[in-house]
Amino acid sequence: MSTDTSGVGVREIDAGALPTRYARGWHCLGVAKDYLEGKPHGVEAFGTKLVVFADSHGDLKVLDGYCRHMGGDLSEGTVKGDEVACPFHDWRWGGDGRCKLVPYARRTPRMARTRSWTTDVRSGLLFVWHDHEGNPPDPAVRIPEIPEAASDEWTDWRWNRILIEGSNCRDIIDNVTDMAHFFYIHFGLPTYFKNVFEGHIASQYLHNVGRPDVDDLGTSYGEAHLDSEASYFGPSFMINWLHNRYGNYKSESILINCHYPVTQNSFVLQWGVIVEKPKGMSEEMTDKLSRVFTEGVSKGFLQDVEIWKHKTRIDNPLLVEEDGAVYQLRRWYEQFYVDVADIKPEMVERFEIEVDTKRANEFWNAEVEKNLKSREVSDDVPAEQH
């Protein structure tokens, strides 16, 4: 038997429309040294293709990826001195976007230009500036340095990336306000959760306790405590300071969670980790610790990816109090998709909210206890009865 629900107030999902532009702001393309190999690198981003190369001084340059002569792919070319040479006809393009030389021609069209993208290197990471209006970056929104990344007392970046298709960048931003998904997706108990949005920065403050009914994240996961401060600096680059405690063991680490759009319905998700080197630990053991921690972070990101791959876009989410400031976060995020002159005060004014986690944790702890008791009963049953 089926029920006709027409006309009884059924809430429909409003998927809305995808943005018609890409976010204004700094976007991280990865670890800078990975582009210092003496060859051009292609990057699919912002609905086009970019080429990244280092000049003779080691300065990284980013241009539109297709040659303005006959459309050759510059990322398939070579670096010659301070220019990238097209593989099609050897036209040479400088980091400023100007055509520097056409070797076979009597005259080089020196007024010919391609698009040159503003770049910055911060904490060993390469950034490119995107602005739909073509304005230069405001110094006030420059990505902050991470001093630990240059310290001998911390490990080097361990970096990962994955292409997410069928999902818009906003899906990952929504996680900033999502307290409940830490239990269901990441198997933790968030006992404290707070958001602060102000200017171009959106922050999340979290205390998370490991679930003792979860085995595959480590035998002592139930003893794990995490204090986390995570801030998006602009639309796509998050720095997450992590303070972990496992019983009597403490560790400090910094996680980068960032992305850049490929199309309006796909993006490259990147994450990188540096870990403070424990005093007295060998380089080999420190490297192993860093690798294990990064693998754990990667597992968490891939848990989110599975959701994004199968969910639908929703502009009118139906929320309860514990879901927090989803609409306020989206209002903050909208500032990067409008002209600077159209930024409204409410997009950048300070907004602060602490989510009451008491009711949620009462329910979740009861579920954890139930799972543990079920496990005890199962363990007491002789093997031949399983």
From Swiss-Prot:
Disulfide-linked positions: none
Cofactor requirement: [2Fe-2S] cluster; Fe cation
EC numbers on record: 1.14.15.30
One of the GO biological process terms: steroid biosynthetic process
Domain Rieske: 26-128
Record-linked InterPro entries: Cholesterol_7-desaturase, KshA-like_C, Rieske_2Fe-2S, Rieske_2Fe-2S_sf
The protein's assembly and partners: Homotrimer. The two-component system 3-ketosteroid-9-alpha-monooxygenase is composed of an oxygenase component KshA and a reductase component KshB.
UniProt-recorded name of the protein: 3-ketosteroid-9-alpha-monooxygenase, oxygenase component
Taxonomic placement: Bacteria, Bacillati, Actinomycetota, Actinomycetes, Mycobacteriales
Originating gene: kshA
